[in-house]
């Protein structure tokens, strides 16, 4: 078989004009010697390139810009047009992507779902296993297997073990939060109906400032990070009033509940991320803030949801907040949601974990889903948890610390271009000075993508990174070097 470089040269020589340069040849050759998944990605790209040229010869002959436009012509993109990746992905293995024009990228921008990279073999094996496809209405050993795996995973560091007794399995993470809102709705009705503890009181919602809990229905109403767009365009948000509290502001949280008592309304639910994924990527909630929230929510009858959809596994190496350092002796929340790392970015799966008290709130008929707890999704969740070894957990923590330390050193080196670094495990970000445009046309994000580093913006003006769980120090240095290059040689705002 031809070498990696020869294969890439062959793809580049036969395709139209490319805009995405990707990693330089020297870098590719250096990583090929240490990471077999890069060679696997290029080998797969060569096969796919030949097949695509047979299937879509005219499309493959187009330049990269025209090719992207042709492919997306009939698709409605949820996000701004100028934040779409500037390339067409053709093959990938591990953290490596190869484009239709032969560029190689290191992917750190998979919205936190690609903890084990692209095409992880145990996950693909679980996903392709022949199944009796049905939902929770048909008992399956796959359901039993994942329930047992979740019980082993959650609470493994605690003397009292797993605090959750029941699990709901849904599709997207946002959907698991939707189910949580139904349960908090049941609780709110019970408490505000005639004879209830908060009878007749108006009902309000609370989350963290900059919090994100999904795009569907009521989860969107709890998502402060997106409220500006919703209120601008949606009639149903015209009269929405979400109470927000700054992360880790204990006094502000106490004041919010004191105001609810004074003004006579009931806070139905308090939703918070243990590590913020959108508003301030990488910022962790402190044990003191959490314990205050747990005490106040219990005192007032509010449902407390911890949204670990993006933070689970990625931030501390553990799926659940209750296993995170500083939280192991604290009382569990009523509900906790997991999704991205748990489904490996390969098949829709989210889990809502329930304590005995919160499980008792569910009422048959208030929610339903065609694919809930289907065996294929269950097996994927089990496979993921089976891949989380002690070494993987430790690497998440160690490399996360290395990333933050090296980004902070880079911030000092660059003298103000990077204004803030936040990070917990492998969810971290660096905020840029306003003279830099973080995303969109002629931005730092776009420049890094064109040069071979996949990244997605977050916060007001930050670059957000979510690398794979087995990332190495060599990869850390690659990313740091590309951030430096983007700041020094990339575009600036204006």
PLM feature spans:
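N-terminal glycine-rich, Lys/His-bearing helix-loop that initiates the first secondary-structure elements
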Residues: 1-164
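PLP-dependent aspartate aminotransferase-fold enzymes
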Residues: 1-21, 114-117, 151-272, 276, ...
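PLP-dependent enzyme catalytic core of the Aspartate aminotransferase-like
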Residues: 2-3, 10, 14, 390, ...
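Active-site PLP attachment segment
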Residues: 215-219, 327-361, 373-378
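Conserved PLP phosphate-binding loop immediately N-terminal to the Schiff-base lysine helix
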Residues: 273-286, 301-327
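Conserved PLP-binding active-site segment of the aspartate aminotransferase-like
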Residues: 280, 371, 430-435, 454-483
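Structural motif of enzymes handling amino- and sulfur-group chemistry
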Residues: 373-395, 399
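Conserved PLP-binding catalytic core of the aspartate aminotransferase-like
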Residues: 400-404, 414-447, 469-472
